[in-house]
Amino acid sequence: MYKNIIKLISGDITKIPEVEAIVNAANSSLEMGGGVCGAIFKAAGSELAQECKEIGGCNTGEAVITKGYNLPNKYIIHTVGPRYSTGENREAERLASAYYESLKLANEKGIRRIAFPSISTGIYRFPVDEGAKIALTTAIKFLDKNPSSFDLILWVLDEKTYIVYKEKYKKLLEI
């Protein structure tokens, strides 16, 4: 079941028209940042920054939704992943929450096709190997509880991160 819904690709998340929503690895102030966040803000245009300013912010492990503006997607779901320090400050739990809350919000809005970046594994320094496992197991758990909720849960990754996710996904499907 999962193989038909959870997919991984290497590419640019701002250029995925086949999904209704993309997820932004946001900062808590919902301002334009670097990496994926910066690319999403640039591609969406200045109206996104205005809507985010009106929302006011988002706590770590939570999610909010905006319009997609100039992106080929109807919505952007903004979620804040944890900054990684020692791994002993509930980072794994908070990262799982960021993914879960994004899926929950998308499901509540009737979104059937969603694309994620790898949350917190860039400038927030979450180990990619552990982050991939958390991302994929959280999606699997969500689908187990809500089997008909999504047609596609896509991870759009850079080449290096894609290789790690692909290996983790392969191992998870063997269990």
Swiss-Prot record:
Query: Which pairs of Cys residues are joined through disulfide bonds in the record?
Result: none
Among InterPro entries, the record links this protein to: Macro_dom, Macro_dom-like
Domain named Macro is located at 1-173
Q: Where is the signal peptide?
A: none
Lineage top rank: taxon: Bacteria
Q: Which Pfam families is this protein grouped with?
A: Macro
Q: Which SMART domains match?
A: A1pp
Give the family from UniProt.
Answer: Belongs to the MacroD-type family.
Spell out the PANTHER family in the cross-references.
GANGLIOSIDE INDUCED DIFFERENTIATION ASSOCIATED PROTEIN 2-RELATED, MACRO DOMAIN-CONTAINING PROTEIN
Under what name is this protein listed?
Uncharacterized protein FN1951
- According to its UniProt entry, this protein's organism is Fusobacterium nucleatum subsp. nucleatum (strain ATCC 25586 / DSM 15643 / BCRC 10681 / CIP 101130 / JCM 8532 / KCTC 2640 / LMG 13131 / VPI 4355)
